[in-house]
Amino acid sequence: MPLQDTTLHIRHLGKQDYESVWHAMQHYTDTRNSESPDELWIVEHPPVFTQGQAGKSEHILNAGDIPVIQVDRGGQVTYHGPGQLVVYPLIDIKRSKIGVRQLVTHIEQSIINMLAKYDIQAYAKADAPGVYVNERKIASLGLRIRRGCSFHGLALNVDMDLAPFRRINPCGYAGLEMVQSKALGGPQTVTEAGEQLTITFSQLLGYQHLVHHQGLAAS
């Protein structure tokens, strides 16, 4: 669906701790107005478990030395760590005239389209948000909508240690197996995955102009 504003600002944040980026997302969402641009934040986090608003403590089996942060997104517990691409779409869905479910579908489809370039057959599930390959999960998804705008986003496993996922029931599903793109012949690095996902995401949502930035804007 074409957007009223066809410019998307891409912010390459590199490696950043989770909480500082989370608070920056909240600040951008709370202070943006009808003229504020849509942005896509691309980042890699140190090891952390994040527990969504629907999260149940019993799904954290053994956090060990990895911190657990309670956050304001939808969904259950997930893991972020080095070698995982994390993308936060900060989209004014009210201005863009797309619904929440449609945005979720677009995000999932952008991952599916990106993996298809590498001949990886991925798919979404109606009852379990995210993207899967052969019943193993390759990407997790959790959004929050506030003031008609989205924040939080997606995490794509690229080239990471998947062992910490065994310390939790990922997204609330006991025994859910995870997989990553490098093992499937997909993107080999977080940088490559970010570049390719930016293309499929912007194409799917109708953005025609991409403006790249290094780091966050000065607040």
Curated annotation (Swiss-Prot):
Return the EC number: 2.3.1.181
Annotated GO molecular function terms are: lipoyl(octanoyl) transferase activity
Q: Where is the BPL/LPL catalytic domain?
A: 34-209
Q: Where are the transmembrane segments?
A: none
InterPro entries (UniProt xref):
aa-tRNA-synth_II/BPL/LPL (IPR045864), BPL_LPL_catalytic (IPR004143), Octanoyltransferase (IPR000544), Octanoyltransferase_CS (IPR020605)
Alphabetized Gene3D superfamilies for the sequence: Bira Bifunctional Protein, Domain 2
Q: Which residues are the active-site ones? A: 171
Record-marked site positions (Lowers pKa of active site Cys): 137
Supply one GO BP term.
Answer: protein modification process
Per its record, the protein catalyses: octanoyl-[ACP] + L-lysyl-[protein] = N(6)-octanoyl-L-lysyl-[protein] + holo-[ACP] + H(+)
Sites binding substrate sit at 73-80, 140-142, 153-155
Q: Name one GO cellular component term.
A: cytoplasm
Keywords of the record, alphabetical order, are:
Acyltransferase, Cytoplasm, Transferase
Question: What top-level class of enzyme does the UniProt entry assign?
Answer: transferase
Keyword Acyltransferase (UniProt): yes
| Compartments (UniProt record) | Cytoplasm
Q: Which domain of life is it from?
A: Bacteria
CDD domains per the UniProt record, alphabetical:
LipB
Q: Which family does it belong to?
A: Belongs to the LipB family.
- NCBIfam families from the entry? lipB, PRK14342.1
Also noted in the record is: In the reaction, the free carboxyl group of octanoic acid is attached via an amide linkage to the epsilon-amino group of a specific lysine residue of lipoyl domains of lipoate-dependent enzymes.
Per the entry, what this protein does is: Catalyzes the transfer of endogenously produced octanoic acid from octanoyl-acyl-carrier-protein onto the lipoyl domains of lipoate-dependent enzymes. Lipoyl-ACP can also act as a substrate although octanoyl-ACP is likely to be the physiological substrate.
Under HAMAP family, the record lists: LipB
Q: What is this protein called?
A: Octanoyltransferase
